[in-house]
């Protein structure tokens, strides 16, 4: 399994419930296609560097996960057809140096969200 990080930006016009529902939907897509979510980060609503689709702000989310390569293809297909996603980026970590950096980012994300590794796995299992 390969190591990935995906960041996506949702429209700021969505309510908190709608944003959380889209976030959960994206997590389900990853899990249903053979991926395992390691950590997540909700960065909240932030100002965009430049207007996208006439929006100046967006709700940012990051998901760190391991998955086979076909999962990313399906995930990006879903991003493209979901109207509420205004921008996305998926990064694959390949070298040992990249993977160790990925692991450090995962630990930082877990500390910020207050999750331990076992809590993240329990949450992932509950959502399946």
UniProtKB/Swiss-Prot annotation:
A GO BP entry: translation
GO molecular function annotation: small ribosomal subunit rRNA binding; structural constituent of ribosome
Pfam families xref list? Ribosomal_S6
At the top level, the lineage of the source is Bacteria
Q: Does the keyword Nucleus apply?
A: no
Q: Does the keyword ATP-binding apply?
A: no
Query: Function, please?
Result: Binds together with bS18 to 16S ribosomal RNA.
Q: Which family does it belong to?
A: Belongs to the bacterial ribosomal protein bS6 family.
Q: What is this protein called?
A: Small ribosomal subunit protein bS6
Which species is this UniProt entry from?
Nitratiruptor sp. (strain SB155-2)
- Coding gene? rpsF
